[in-house]
Amino acid sequence: RAMRGDWESVKNRPAFTLFEENGHYRVTTYRKTYRGTIQTETYQISEQDGNLFIETGLSVLLTYDKENDRILLSPGGEYKRSNQPIKR
């Protein structure tokens, strides 16, 4: 699927990787801690009524703009495809 890959926020929010595992799509977020280490969290993506949601405990709507190759998270803002691998 075209959405797979590394994504970075246009507004300095945590980056994420979208990937497929065992037939399910997942998102791993990367957040830098105050000590400078990278903390990761992985969430499953589900589909409800034709909409994609990241299951974080809250409903985070994920919309992919194929024409502009952008992802919009609501809440969370706009993400663009990363040109370089995310530091893990």
Set out the residue ranges of the language-model regions:
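Beta-sheet ligand-binding and adhesion/scaffold domains
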Residues: 9-16, 24, 49-88
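N-terminal glycine/threonine-rich, aromatic-flanked beta-hairpin/loop signature
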Residues: 12-50
